[in-house]
Amino acid sequence: MNIIMVDHMKYQHNITSEIINNIPVIYIEGDLTSDADGDAKNVYSEVKEKYSPHKVIINFENTKYINSSGIATLIHIIQDVNERGGVIAFVGLTEHLKKVMNIVGISDFVQMYNSNNDAVKTV
């Protein structure tokens, strides 16, 4: 499991990953901002190098806040997965985060599920 925890004065985040049924799940806890950008990309890169996955799940159950830098990070990951012919799923989005994903158009490129189990069964 990859674990990166950062606690800045304004933003806090914890980005981890695990494998469920051979599918990497990346957990984004706290805030997905420019402070988390490098850590999110590093965890994704480690998962990519180790497992070369064609399916990736990103779990937002404990994500509190996302800004434009966080959106850019997600777009980077989505593009990379799509370029390799893969599928990406988002799990546990709040209604607010779903609305944000719809507004910026990300929801057109990912599958959305309520739980890891739902995503693992379908992806």
Locate the predicted segments by residue.
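N-terminal amphipathic/basic-hydrophobic helices that include classical n-h-c signal peptides
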Residues: 1-8
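STAS-typified acidic loop motif
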Residues: 9-42, 60
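Residues that form or immediately flank small-molecule/cofactor binding pockets and catalytic motifs
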Residues: 22, 95, 117
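Amphipathic alpha-helical interaction surfaces in cytosolic regulatory modules
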Residues: 32-110
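Residues at or immediately preceding the N-termini of alpha-helices
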Residues: 37, 116-117
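Short acidic-hydrophobic, aromatic-tinged amphipathic segments that line or gate anion-handling sites
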Residues: 111-115
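A charged, well-structured terminal subsegment
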Residues: 117-123
